[in-house]
Amino acid sequence: MGRGRVQLKRIENKINRQVTFSKRRAGLFKKAHEISVLCDAEVALVVFSHKGKLFEYSTDSCMEKILERYERYSYAERQLIAPESDVNTNWSMEYNRLKAKIELLERNQRHYLGEDLQAMSPKELQNLEQQLDTALKHIRSRKNQLMYDSVNELQRKEKAIQEQNSMLSKQIKEREKVLRAQQEQWDQQNHGQNMPPPPPPQEHQIQHPYMLSHQPSPFLNMGGLYEEEDPMAMRRNDLDLSLEPVYNCNLGCFAS
């Protein structure tokens, strides 16, 4: 006899229900993978357990891309066939769509942070790992580019500072050279002003007759001693007669 048709109904035993759910879920994911490989189709499968736990499967394409594609397609068709009276309904559906998208993004964010990974299959974990590796490559590439640009900017500033220092050093040397030349010129002028004037030549000097009186001549001191060294003593001599006029007078008398 052939096997009878199994009646589908809710399994009352919680343990049996959980075991059946795990087996059927694995078989369903396997069938989805087979159809995606054999038929080259994009498949997205979402399953929620009776406790609200999420299980999903997608092909090599990202789950978000498949859902966005489905939403665009279904929303465009609904817009074509929906009457104007269903505008409020469309807004409600749009709200639900955005809400589901936010929940999906939050879940992916938790996955990227390494949280809530228990419900993910090995295939999903592998896809997540590939996405993280790609993100790390982009991050490292961007970081290296920023560091390279920063080094080039610092080198450019260093070159500009070196050129400025060279120009300032050249200006300082030129200024010192000018100051040194001015100092030498000033020293030469001061040296020429401090030198005594040269004495007049002796052979061209003419003695005036009246200058002969400054030559020493014999004196007759009748008031006291004469000291040539002390000028004050000369004032104490009331009578200092020169012998030269007397001598000249006597010679004149004898001659007459």
UniProtKB/Swiss-Prot annotation:
Subcellular location: Nucleus
One Gene Ontology CC term in the entry: nucleus
Keyword Ribonucleoprotein part of the UniProt annotation: no
Domain of life: Eukaryota
Keyword Metal-binding appears in the UniProt entry: no
PROSITE patterns: K_BOX, MADS_BOX_1, MADS_BOX_2
Domain called K-box: residue spans: 88-178
Gene Ontology molecular function terms on file: DNA-binding transcription factor activity; protein dimerization activity; RNA polymerase II transcription regulatory region sequence-specific DNA binding
InterPro entries membership: MADS-box/MEF2_TF, MEF2-like_N, TF_Kbox, TF_MADSbox, TF_MADSbox_sf
Alphabetically ordered keywords of this record: Activator, Coiled coil, Developmental protein, Differentiation, DNA-binding, Flowering, Nucleus, Transcription, Transcription regulation
Segments of this protein annotated with the region Disordered: 180-206
Domain MADS-box: 1-61
Entry's Gene Ontology BP terms: cell differentiation; flower development; positive regulation of transcription by RNA polymerase II
Entries under SUPFAM superfamilies matching the protein: SRF-like
Function: Transcription factor that promotes early floral meristem identity in synergy with LEAFY. Displays a redundant function with CAULIFLOWER in the up-regulation of LEAFY. Required subsequently for the transition of an inflorescence meristem into a floral meristem, and for the normal development of sepals and petals in flowers. Regulates positively B class homeotic proteins.
Quaternary structure note: Homodimer capable of binding to CArG-box sequences.
Protein name: Floral homeotic protein APETALA 1
